[in-house]
């Protein structure tokens, strides 16, 4: 039997990259999927691909920084069925160092934290009643930078946001365990997604720096995140909560 049969999974950031790959992976394991993304067409494409494969998916546009919009979409999805899996995958990245133009750095700080950290909070809070009712599973997308700041140029706001996602994951796991809700995170390394396509093309030396520090010697693909995401959303991880599964080719071990 598919690992996620009978589950209704909500995936934010489903319009591209890691979120899209996970949405497809969840559907292939039997879950009904609601694909959410600020890019309405991206979310629609993910849902169309799932439905074309014989799965069941719906899609909606969502700006995760809008708390009221998150609550409204949760109410709408409640009519589809109780949500038992929430994958918080919406995220952005900027690469201004702290010593760059002060106004640009401040805007990065506001924008990145609004999406990566506050967005995770907003969506989780909106779906929490349903997740408590179903004794559901929350999977947050963290990062290598949930633990460290990359040696390659990166915004400190991104590092702070992903540290925050890990802290939020652990705090919720401690609080919601009594309700039967499990909360975990995934820590991707350098995964080939649209978010970093420009950096990979224009700064090959940054990619090489990552590879030299990575035992497996390659960058990751969005599909590399799917297995861990299914594991954390399924009964295979029934006694796992408050942890982060690193999917970084071994970068964080050396």
Regions found by a protein language model. Name each.
Residues 40-41, 61-72, 224:
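The beta1-alpha1 cofactor-binding region of Rossmann-like NAD(H)/NADP(H)-dependent oxidoreductases
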């Amino acid at each position: 039997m598919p690992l996620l049969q009978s589950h209704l999974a909500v995936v934010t950031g489903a319009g591209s990259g890691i979120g899209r790959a996970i949405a497809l992976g969840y559907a292939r394991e039997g879950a009904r999927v609601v694909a959410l993304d600020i890019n309405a067409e991206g979310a629609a494409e993910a849902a169309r691909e799932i439905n074309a494969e014989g799965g069941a998916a719906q899609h909606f546009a969502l700006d995760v920084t809008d708390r009221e919009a998150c609550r409204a979409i949760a109410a709408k999805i409640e009519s589809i069925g109780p949500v038992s899996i929430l994958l918080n995958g919406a995220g952005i990245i900027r690469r201004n160092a702290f010593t760059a133009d002060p106004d640009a750095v401040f805007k990065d700080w506001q924008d990145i934290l609004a999406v990566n950290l506050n967005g995770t909070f907003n969506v989780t809070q909106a779906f929490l009643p349903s997740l408590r009712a179903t004794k559901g599973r929350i999977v947050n997308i963290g990062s290598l930078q949930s633990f460290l700041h990359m040696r390659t140029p990166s915004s400190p706001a991104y590092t702070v946001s992903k540290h925050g996602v890990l802290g939020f994951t652990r705090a919720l796991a401690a609080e919601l365990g009594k309700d039967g809700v499990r909360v975990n995170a995934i820590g991707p390394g350098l995964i080939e997604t649209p978010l970093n396509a420009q950096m990979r093309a224009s700064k090959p030396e940054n990619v090489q720096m990552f590879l030299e520090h990575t035992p497996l010697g390659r960058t990751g693909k969005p599909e590399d995140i799917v297995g861990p995401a299914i594991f954390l959303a399924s009964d295979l991880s029934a006694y796992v909560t408050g942890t982060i599964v690193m999917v970084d080719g071994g970068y964080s071990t050396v």
